[in-house]
Amino acid sequence: MRITLVGMGSGAPGGLTVRGLAALQGAGLIIGARRLLQNLPDGCTDNRTALYKTDEICALLQGAGCEQAAVVFSGDTGFYSGAGALCRALDAAGTPYTVEPGVSSVQL
């Protein structure tokens, strides 16, 4: 499975990059905080699960059974975000992933 951690900046679709949008639109499963899932742009799967705890996200990803999954985060995925904890957990499990940062508040 290909896993992408997608930054959504402030949480609005305008905080997505082109690559982040492509990852979301190609995903068969999208995981994240409820408010982020409610703000996903058109063309994204309806297979969405509202989770934010790292251990719960990892468990769901392990049993997902889809080719591509995305986990959405607000904030800056490289600085202050839950993405850091998930990266550490995926690294510890030997699970490959990519990170697509969103538009951060510093850039706005």
Predicted regions and their residues:
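Class I S-adenosyl-L-methionine
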Residues: 1-108
